[in-house]
Amino acid sequence: YATCASVNDVICHGFPGKYVLQDGDIVTIDMVVNLNGWLADSAWSYAVGQVTPEAQHLLDVTKTSLYKGIELAVIGNRIGDISNAIQTYAEGEGLSVVREFIGHGIGEKMHEEPQVPHYGPPHRGPRLKEGMVITIEPMLNIG
């Protein structure tokens, strides 16, 4: 699997290239690991040097929205509970949720059911069950 490096306004799945990171950039590293046929997917965004206050706000709110979603990822809750927690927090902080890319189930395949959007009403979608493995990958925009 590829390691993706997305810089600044590239939301996700960017590929490493010849661009040299500059002070003030944001870079997101997205990696997939295969261990004995089971996949793991992780992405994290980093500030390069000093970023603007607006960019730092984006990083901080995205991280907090991830943890707000994780807090609701418990057996018996629904996917929509996670989705709504992310959207509610992000929009309350003046950011918008990217709707073109979502989280997903993961296991022996990279993209499995259920889909995990980062927006939508609570109490909807599949119930979380023991043994279910999902990715929660909030992607937010300024404005």
Give the predicted meaning of each segment.
Residues 1-143:
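Active-site neighborhoods and metal-handling regions in enzymes and metal-associated proteins
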